[in-house]
Amino acid sequence: MPSCLRLYPILAALSALLLSGCDDGGGSGHTNLRLVNVSPGYDSLDLYANTADDDTDRQHVAGVTYQTVSSYTQLESGTYNVKFKRSGVTSTLLTVSGRAFADDTHHTFVAFGSAGHFASLQIDDDVAPPDSGRTKVQVLNVAEAGSLDVYLTESSVSLDDATPVVAGVAAGTSSAVSTIDSGDYRLRVTGASDSDDLRLDVPNITLDSRQVLSLILTATQGGVLVEAWTLPQQGSLTKFANTKARIRGAVGTTAGPVVMRVGGVGVLNGAVGVVGNYAQVEAGSVPVTLTVNGVAVAVPNQTLVAGGEYTLLTWTNASGTQTTLIGDDNRLPTASGKAKIRVMNGLSSLDVPLTLAVNFSPIAEGIALGQASAFTEVDDGTDYQLDVTNTDTAANLVTKTSVTLQSAAVYTLFMSANGTTVSGTLRKDR
């Protein structure tokens, strides 16, 4: 037999092997990766991967913008170091090492975190579906809002009579997979072990029969309320937005007791120096009802952004009672071991600009009556001294000693005065 004829079977086999390697569907010897970007601190992300014996960063997913999911990209199966970078930036945000990806598998990386808190979680997208009439659910808590409980109930059920489907999911972690009955539910998310601490209320969410679903809890701009996304296995993202904002009142006026309602919800009933607790109201343009010493004060509607946090400060000048809507940034500090602090000026009886110093170092200056400074990050620690002075004269107004500032906490020093008696109330906002 001629030698060329003996080569035909070998060439045919090689040709078939090469063609199988071109299969876009992730055939034998390949794995599939994709990236979800729900990281408010990073507008666009790239994903790189390299094997243990090759330290060259190879880009596999590019330009995944905030609140989107990429298509799957195909890699040879094996063990990889996976890296995340800002789009177009060479420095690496995070490396997850030694990830083993088997043949014919699918994996989703969920990137999350505010600026300085970038992280990721991995979802394996080849979970066996449950029986008919059942749904598998896994919760990912990427909201930076503490540990959370998740309830799925009928719409009329009180949380006092309900048990979480998934309880105590710590920030930056995912739960085990739970299997529950399929159907329509009301979704509610609360702080862990506190059914009164409502963070999200979705009137209706549908869990399909034999579905495998990831429920991703994400941050809002204020830092405490959360939103939800559903991501079916190998499917697309669906957002369940939070329609609420949180608001509280603060009293700087000395004209008498203040009663305040925002969007029909009572947020304050107190005298000068009082800072109320946060209450949830529907976001949008909301009416304000205000009485001072029993006399109604006209206040225009206030615009609240969904997921936002606010303080409505009442104060007085020569023109009478005034109000200021102040945005509250209750997001975490950008680095571990840090706290955030600001000063709010409600000194109606003095009407002077304020300077706040932490351990004798000024961090805010010239803060006018009815305003608040931006937050400043400081190291956490004990035995701090806080000094508030008149910016114009440097006269001391308040000194607080032996102050503890906790890591990952947010503080407001609210300044008020009753006559010539000045006081400063340090509030822990989160």
Task: Briefly describe each language-model feature range.
Residues C22-R430:
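Intrinsically disordered, low-complexity polar regions and short flexible loop motifs
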Residues M1-S20:
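Sec-dependent bacterial lipoprotein signal peptides
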